[in-house]
Amino acid sequence: MLFENLKIRDVNLKNRVVVSPMCQYSAKDGYIQTHHKTHYGQLAMGGAGLIFLEATGVTAQGRITNGCLGIWDDKQIEGLREITQSIKVLGSIPAIQLGHAGQKASMQRPWHGNGPQTTIDTDRGDIIWEPIAPMDRPLDEGWLKPRKMERKELDEVRDAFVKASERSIEAGFEVIEIHMAHGYLLHSFLSPLSNSRNDEYGGSIENRMRFPLEVVKKVRETIGENVPLFVRISAEDGLDGGWTIEDSINFCHILKEQGV
């Protein structure tokens, strides 16, 4: 079965082998570099049916690190299109994971420590920016304190996901995935451990799901019914009082109704 073809909406996969999104931390100002062209071309030569580009920031401030790819500018489409074309030539389907790092933005690259950035990082040429999140609580002691998102910023980020999905289609990606896991922005709205807002986007589980579901709805409307839309979630927080596996099951039923 692994090597049988699979049709998902209008996309035909030659097999069911999927290369998951794996950050390369090798972009410059969010743009594709030679490393990416070599890396993804090599993956396509392996024969996988579906190949995901790494987590790609829908805004510059939504990147995990200075080395993460971005899709917030039309000028970034050209480099991304080179990747999709090379993947397609070798018979695989190109996919992209769209994300916003939220409170975990502006981190060090793994080989520089994988923690919050410091003056050591700026000395090597990286920049530090202010993260945004549902609340103004830092991820942990010593981490950058995020700015609590106002309603206007929710609208801006939602629109950024929409624009990113438009650019993804223009660049030649045939499958789109929204990143809602690992403590990044959309996951942090879902979890009661990171979201204690007192407006319509916090409190009850219905309110905490509201913003992520709004993003899904707008992206689905933008890309149409024929393009497969995936969502990556963390099954549970693994902490008392956090997001549970039962929450995930309920959420997945709702996502399916929304066209995921």
Locate predicted features.
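A cross-family glycoside hydrolase active-site/sugar-binding cleft signature
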Residues: 20, 54, 95-99, 135, ...
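Active-site glycine- and acidic-residue-rich loops that bind
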Residues: 30, 158-162, 167-169, 201-214, ...
